[in-house]
Swiss-Prot record:
Catalysed conversion reaction: (S)-2,3,4,5-tetrahydrodipicolinate + NAD(+) + H2O = (2S,4S)-4-hydroxy-2,3,4,5-tetrahydrodipicolinate + NADH + H(+); (S)-2,3,4,5-tetrahydrodipicolinate + NADP(+) + H2O = (2S,4S)-4-hydroxy-2,3,4,5-tetrahydrodipicolinate + NADPH + H(+)
Record: active site: 132 (proton donor/acceptor), 136 (proton donor)
UniProt pathway: Amino-acid biosynthesis; L-lysine biosynthesis via DAP pathway; (S)-tetrahydrodipicolinate from L-aspartate: step 4/4
Gene: dapB
An annotated Gene Ontology molecular function: NAD binding
Keywords, in A-Z order: Amino-acid biosynthesis, Cytoplasm, Diaminopimelate biosynthesis, Lysine biosynthesis, NAD, NADP, Oxidoreductase
Biological process according to GO: diaminopimelate biosynthetic process; lysine biosynthetic process via diaminopimelate
Protein name, entry field: 4-hydroxy-tetrahydrodipicolinate reductase
Function according to Swiss-Prot or TrEMBL: Catalyzes the conversion of 4-hydroxy-tetrahydrodipicolinate (HTPA) to tetrahydrodipicolinate.
Protein source organism: Mycobacterium ulcerans (strain Agy99)
Annotated binding of NAD(+), by residue: 7-12, 75-77, 102-105
E.C. number: 1.17.1.8
InterPro entries recorded: DapB_C (IPR022663), DapB_N (IPR000846), DapB_N_CS (IPR022664), DHDPR_bac (IPR023940), NAD(P)-bd_dom_sf (IPR036291)
Length: 245
């Protein structure tokens, strides 16, 4: 398969360039970064693209890719419900094209979200702390937002988090994502980390994942690239590829 990388000069993008070059069954067809024309992808007969760019440009990238029939594996964050609906609308006009958007491609991170969903109904309280490098554009992270939504779904019909806080500074209790408090840390020296904290009478449970290097994303991204065209339309997350439903 001929694979292009968008955001090829970024830290994650450069890692993906090396990963594609090292994969015996993939051919690196294009390296595209800010200022380079997207037409490079069509001129090089690129079949699938890995996008690790920026929330400000990812929608324009996807519109181009979908209408040119190029499959996309997207690690760029910042996808609101409205953006997802727009992508689905574009894909409806190109039913054979596939887009996979994942908040996290690290296998351990995906498993931690799955474990959190399983644990959620058994605890009274749940909160999330996500920790990233200070260059990250969005807060809370896509992984934390998705984790919170999964926890909220698993706790549907149960009592909300107990919390007697009556006065606080703005933001002190974190962002509220479907009733789950999410706290974002931006600190030099970090890459990507998340803790999910559960509590109930007499015990707590912490599920933590740490990406210590951006190569942690490579196995998940390459899995998605190899299988994206099997799933025309929109796929959210790599859970279906890991049989985690």
């Amino acid at each position: 398969m001929r694979v292009g990388v968008l955001g090829a000069k970024g830290k994650v993008g450069a890692t993906m360039v090396s990963a594609v070059e090292s994969a015996a069954d993939l051919t690196l067809s294009a390296e595209v970064d800010a200022g380079d024309p997207l037409s490079t992808l069509t001129e090089t007969n690129t079949e699938a693209v890995i996008d690790f760019t920026h929330p400000d440009v990812v929608m324009g990238n996807l519109e181009f890719l979908i209408f040119n029939g190029i499959h996309a594996v997207v690690g760029t964050t910042g996808f609101t419900a409205e953006r997802v609906e727009q992508v689905q609308s574009w894909l409806a006009k190109k039913p054979s094209t596939a887009v996979l958007i994942a908040p996290n491609f690290a296998i351990g991170a995906v498993l931690s979200m799955h474990f959190a969903k399983q644990a959620a109904p058994f605890f009274d309280s749940a909160e999330i702390i996500e920790l990233h490098h200070p260059q990250k554009a969005d807060a809370p992270s896509g992984t934390a937002t998705r984790t919170a939504k999964l926890i909220a779904e698993a706790r549907e019909g149960l009592a909300p988090n107990p919390d007697a806080t009556s006065t606080s500074l703005p933001g002190a209790r974190g962002a509220d994502v479907d009733g789950i408090p999410v706290h974002a840390v931006r600190l030099a020296g970090l890459v990507a980390h998340q803790e999910v904290l559960f509590g109930t009478q007499g015990e707590t449970l912490t599920i933590r994942h740490d990406s210590l290097d951006r190569t942690s994303f490579v196995p998940g991204v390459l899995l998605a690239v190899r299988r994206v065209r099997e799933r025309p339309g929109l796929t959210i997350g790599i859970e279906p590829l890991l049989n985690l439903q």
